[in-house]
From Swiss-Prot:
Domain of life: Bacteria
Family classification: Belongs to the SAICAR synthetase family.
Gene Ontology molecular function terms on file: ATP binding; phosphoribosylaminoimidazolesuccinocarboxamide synthase activity
Pfam families according to UniProt: SAICAR_synt (PF01259)
Keywords, comma-separated and alphabetical: ATP-binding, Ligase, Nucleotide-binding, Purine biosynthesis
Pathway: Purine metabolism; IMP biosynthesis via de novo pathway; 5-amino-1-(5-phospho-D-ribosyl)imidazole-4-carboxamide from 5-amino-1-(5-phospho-D-ribosyl)imidazole-4-carboxylate: step 1/2
GO biological process, one term: cobalamin biosynthetic process
Keyword Ligase set for record: yes
EC number: 6.3.2.6
Protein name: Phosphoribosylaminoimidazole-succinocarboxamide synthase
Lineage: Bacteria, Bacillati, Cyanobacteriota, Cyanophyceae, Oscillatoriophycideae
Originating species: Trichodesmium erythraeum (strain IMS101)
Entry-linked InterPro entries: SAICAR_synt/ADE2_N, SAICAR_synt_PurC, SAICAR_synth, SAICAR_synthetase, SAICAR_synthetase_CS
Length: 242
């Protein structure tokens, strides 16, 4: 395939080939979706913000011995990544009750969980990304027992690192979604992105349930000032690291 041929387009990113078959170019879009793409819109500047935030977080995780697909960013909205085979599993780590966890249980939003809750969803839009047990994952052969154990270990470690990091930015990490892939050597690698699109982030300077939201919930719940929330996350990360 020729250089920069479109390989795949998702809701928030486009993947392109490069001259190196083992390296892909990810373009971060300003498009926003929610509720399995039932709600669509545009968040101005989101692509550049998410790309920059993800690059900083991937670098942080790499220094803490979490392997990622990140290589570098040739532009503010583009990221070069190692080619991996994505596992069709969305891994969710929750520290505070919010979103679907509240809808599916009697927990109220804001309840601090006794321990980090690690959940798995089948990445399948047709099925609306159903919650899966470990045994269902194994029966569907979405991952091996060894891979699931490693995924959980990585997820818990990533959570510890990010809680500490965001706390230093005066941001509370409520929950987040991550994805993993396998490289050509079958090594498990963190892929996709970590940004306000995939994390719930609350401003520690705010107490109002709506004002504190700094993530895509501002878009989901029509809270307004979506761009401002994303930009504030980026500014605090840059200020902390600068």
């Amino acid at each position: 395939m020729s250089s920069h041929q479109k390989l795949y387009e998702g809701k928030a990113k486009i993947l392109y080939t490069t001259d190196d078959p083992e390296i892909l170019l990810t373009y971060f879009k300003d498009d926003a979706t929610a509720f399995n793409a039932q709600k669509k819109g545009t968040i101005t500047g989101k692509g550049k913000i998410n790309c920059t935030i993800s690059s900083h977080i991937f670098k942080l995780l790499e220094t803490n011995e979490i392997p990622t697909h990140f290589i570098d960013c040739p532009a503010s909205d583009k990221m070069r990544v190692r080619r991996v085979k994505i596992l069709p599993i969305e891994v969710i780590v929750r520290n505070i009750a919010a979103g679907s966890l509240c809808r599916q249980t009697l927990l109220t939003e804001g309840t601090i969980l006794k321990f980090p809750l690690v959940e798995y969803c089948y990445k399948n839009d047709t099925l609306q990304d159903p919650l899966l047990t470990r045994d269902r994952l194994l029966i569907l052969e979405l991952a091996t027992p060894e891979q699931l154990e490693q995924i959980r270990t990585f997820a818990v470690k990533i959570n510890d690192i990010l809680i500490n990091f965001f706390n230093q930015c005066q941001i509370t990490l409520v929950d987040f979604k991550i994805e993993f892939g396998l490289d050509k050597h079958e090594n498990l690698i963190l892929a996709d992105e970590i940004s306000p699109d995939s994390c719930r982030l609350w401003d520690q300077y705010q107490t109002d349930p709506n004002q504190r939201v700094m993530d895509k919930d501002r878009f989901r719940r029509d809270l307004g000032k979506v761009e401002t929330g994303y930009q504030q996350v980026l500014e605090r990360i840059l200020a902390h690291q600068g």
